[in-house]
Amino acid sequence: MTRGEMKYEGKAKRVYATEQAGEYIVEYKDDATAFNGVKKAQIMGKGEINNAITAHLYPLLEAAGIPTHFLEKLSDREQRVRAVTIVPVEIIVRNVAAGSFSKRLGIEEGTPLPRPVVEYCYKSDALGDPLINTDTAVALGWATEADLARIRELSLQVRDFLVPYFEARGVRLVDFKLEFGKLSSGEIVLADEISPDTCRFWDAQTNEKMDKDRFRRDLGGVEDAYAEMLRRVTQSV
């Protein structure tokens, strides 16, 4: 399979057309951004690690009955995916208070939530990915009520799979962001990635951060944290 025209370039990935109708190649970059692109840097090897983690987890999610766009890992930085139209509504699933949630609501970071909290954001770097509700998404034509119900259902299924998976590997899944897309058939599938870029991972014993917060908060050790997460994700237990 060969890369054709670049269809899209985001903060962390490039998407290319292929000779196969309905399939794209996704290339993972080492570019790191925070605060909706305000802070920028390079994290050496990040693209390879995020590609490897996503390529490991998505087939497991598929086996658990969660449809995804993932088809196969092509190289250290590339994977083959099904072409989707991205729904411009990002989903954040929170298990523990952290980040903007703690600041916005005055809840101490690290406070366990008695049930998962699902938040919706409009996917727009220019606007800072603002929080929205489902009424807004429907009124502005970003998604239908049925789309959003299915997206919520799938998001919680992802959560129910990932929480015990990471617990077994000594990792606390604090929160995570998901993106979904529509196939040409109209089916909604999980797209994008699951990685230290899109999740808050804390060590279960020490609460040490093993994700992009190390970059956001200038904690250092970013490359080592990403490498450790790859080791744990692929660890057999």
Curated annotation (Swiss-Prot):
UniProt KW keywords: ATP-binding, Ligase, Nucleotide-binding, Purine biosynthesis
Listed Pfam families: SAICAR_synt
GO molecular function, one term: ATP binding
Pathway annotation from the record: Purine metabolism; IMP biosynthesis via de novo pathway; 5-amino-1-(5-phospho-D-ribosyl)imidazole-4-carboxamide from 5-amino-1-(5-phospho-D-ribosyl)imidazole-4-carboxylate: step 1/2
CDD domains named among the record's database cross-references: SAICAR_synt_PurC (cd01415)
Segments passing through the bilayer: none
Span of the signal peptide: none
EC number: 6.3.2.6
Catalytic activity: 5-amino-1-(5-phospho-D-ribosyl)imidazole-4-carboxylate + L-aspartate + ATP = (2S)-2-[5-amino-1-(5-phospho-beta-D-ribosyl)imidazole-4-carboxamido]succinate + ADP + phosphate + 2 H(+)
Family matches, as SUPFAM superfamilies: SAICAR synthase-like (SSF56104)
Example GO BP: 'de novo' IMP biosynthetic process
Family statement drawn from the similarity comment of this UniProt entry: Belongs to the SAICAR synthetase family.
Protein name: Phosphoribosylaminoimidazole-succinocarboxamide synthase
Organism: Deinococcus deserti (strain DSM 17065 / CIP 109153 / LMG 22923 / VCD115)
